[in-house]
Amino acid sequence: FWLDKYHIDGLRIGALSSMLYLDYGKTEGEWEPNKFGGKENLDAVDFVKRLNTAVHMYHPDVMMFAEENTSWPKLTHKIEDGGLGFDFKWNMGWMNDMLHYMSLNPMWRPFNHDSLTFSFYYAFSEKFLLPISHDEVSHGKGSLIKQMPGKYDEQFAGVRAFITYMYAHPGKKLVFMGTEIGQFDEWNHEEAIQWDLLEFEKHKKLRTFFKELNKFYLDCKPLYELDTVWKGFDWIHHDDYANSVIAFKRTDKNGDEIVSVCNFQPIRRCLLYTSPS
């Protein structure tokens, strides 16, 4: 119905773990194992496979997303290869790590450097989407800019650093509405986005930043062509804890490269890194 009548671009299956595991959120005695003695919900697995197959058959341009917070394997692999057939998995680990890291006073970030780099260890195990969704800017959590530490100007700088790093990181991008104008109030489904903020210079410049970054991203194939495989990524420097800096290289199918150097301290740096290649 949603695909046929409203022509939506994709479907997200939320809380997928509660479907896939018979014991999810239950204590001993509240669930029974499957016929093989395991905790996997075989009926749910079959339903998900059939759902993804049907969507891709009748609407091949529609994307299917999995929000799953465990390490269920092969969510985005082909069904014939033992997968569940989703197009992308929400990278909840990256999201939680980065929101925690960016909320820290910069002086504490050197002690939490692993939150910045850990996602690269599994970045290519699935086809990932990097999500900043409605869940992260509502329910008392505050908007993205409100979660940034420091004074007014520093919060805008925090958003720019976070989003630029997000666009350089392997994985597709999802940014929730209102983030692009620096809305300080968290999202409320009963209210509109506060477009009047664009009367203020900082908010207007932030929207321009998003506009230019999106254009740069679309024009820069190394940032997305090999988004799901190690071939498109190389570390240059990942353990500069003291300076809160990481550097890496992205590559496209033709071998063209772009280098990303991310500084998460409010201090100008002059650093020399040597690429392993």
Predicted regions located by residue number:
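Conserved alpha/beta catalytic core and glycan-binding cleft of carbohydrate-active enzymes
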Residues: 7-9, 27-189, 218-222, 227-271
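Conserved small/polar residues in nucleotide/adenosyl-binding loops
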Residues: 273-277
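Conserved, mostly hydrophobic/aromatic
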Residues: 2, 13, 64, 213, ...
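Extended hydrophobic/aromatic segments used for targeting, binding, or gating
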Residues: 193-196, 208
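Catalytic cores of secreted or luminal carbohydrate-active enzymes
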Residues: 202-223
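Active-site groove signature of glycoside hydrolases
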Residues: 3-23
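Solvent-exposed, charged/polar functional surfaces in cytosolic regulatory/catalytic domains
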Residues: 1, 54, 212, 216
